[in-house]
């Protein structure tokens, strides 16, 4: 019998496991993959966001700003590599500049510090190989390795007594009651676990877990983003993430370039709604789009710089027809006692993981 069963061993589930491991609780994490951080948590740009892209008063804005401000301390505690590089959101047209000013004002409402609108000369001072007529400069944006980060939190939780059960996909949940307690019976493909509490951190499958307990109001719409990884020869020319002005109707922040903590460069992601939650394929059409759009901001890339490609899937609560973003859903359910439901945790989930916990 466990006090708490966490479903999902990504960055959110592992952050919660680490936080709860500080208390005298018997905790397990049920992860359907063979390791932690195999899905959304590990298939992204690895950016520590500042919080200017999110609507004021939203949970996304609140947790992103808090997560950014406190990340130096977290990185030190976990002994993980992290670099506060800054970030440029570059524009070319009058409409772009108006949007950048709006983003700056929104960020300041959210509590983001140090934002500036800068001209072309200042762009060249900060990142000489990035193109743009003007930009929003965010000095507090950073980069990290999401795998190393998530694994470090999971290892810390395990050191404190948390049990991780990998390759354990939840297939059914029943809520029974004995004379003293309400007990969840969680059936996986491998075993049956009993727990007093459940925390649903299942990411792409969080709606599926909710439906096992009668929660029908949420549907996750998988939105795939494809990336190229560039050789480290290119990495020395890009010292901070460079983004375009985002299209509010799209499911992401636009095709951008991000230096990795290891010295490579990511181009991407695209934004394409798909039917399957496990279709991590890549397509030539999208790869051509990455080259075209990425080259507008950073024209120094060549095909010989490409090492490999990959994709990730965003767990979006908004359908393709609606576009844009919904807020994080984090609920202590009144209709299901002892059940905490987290769903729609897309970007900036990586930045927000510790405050969410």
Show which residues each predicted segment covers.
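Conserved Rossmann-like nucleotide-cofactor binding loop
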Residues: 12, 35, 205
């Amino acid at each position: 019998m466990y006090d708490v069963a966490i479903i999902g061993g990504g960055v959110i589930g592992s952050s919660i496991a680490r936080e709860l491991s500080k208390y005298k609780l018997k905790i397990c994490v049920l992860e359907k993959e063979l390791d932690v951080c195999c899905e959304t948590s590990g298939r992204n740009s690895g950016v520590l966001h500042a919080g200017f892209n999110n609507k004021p008063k939203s949970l996304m804005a609140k947790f992103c700003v808090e997560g950014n401000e406190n990340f130096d301390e977290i990185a030190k505690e976990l002994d993980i590599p992290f670099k506060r590089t800054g970030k440029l959101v570059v524009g070319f047209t009058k409409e772009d500049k108006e949007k950048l000013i709006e983003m700056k004002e929104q960020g300041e409402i959210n509590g983001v510090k140090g934002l500036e609108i800068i001209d072309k000369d200042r762009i060249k001072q900060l990142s000489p190989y990035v193109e743009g007529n003007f930009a929003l400069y965010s000095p507090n944006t950073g980069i990290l390795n999401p795998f190393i980060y998530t694994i470090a939190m999971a290892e810390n939780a395990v050191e404190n007594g948390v049990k991780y059960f990998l390759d354990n996909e939840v297939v059914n949940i029943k809520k029974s009651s004995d004379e003293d307690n309400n007990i969840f019976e969680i059936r996986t493909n491998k075993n049956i676990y009993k727990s007093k509490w459940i925390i649903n951190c299942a990411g792409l499958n969080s709606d599926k877990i909710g439906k096992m307990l009668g929660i029908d109001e949420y549907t996750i719409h998988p939105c795939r983003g494809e990336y190229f990884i560039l050789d480290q020869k290119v990495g020395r020319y890009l010292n901070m993430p460079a983004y375009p002005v985002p299209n509010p109707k799209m499911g992401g922040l636009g095709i951008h370039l991000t230096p990795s903590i290891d010295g490579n460069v990511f181009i991407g992601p695209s934004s394409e709604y798909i039917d399957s939650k496990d279709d991590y394929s890549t397509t030539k059409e999208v790869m051509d789009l990455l080259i075209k759009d990425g080259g507008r901001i950073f024209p120094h890339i060549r095909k010989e710089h490409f090492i490999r490609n990959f994709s990730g899937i965003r767990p979006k609560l908004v359908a393709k027809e609606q576009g844009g973003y919904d807020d994080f859903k984090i609920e202590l359910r009144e209709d299901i006692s002892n059940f905490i439901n987290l769903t729609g945790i897309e970007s900036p989930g990586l930045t927000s993981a510790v405050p969410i916990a």
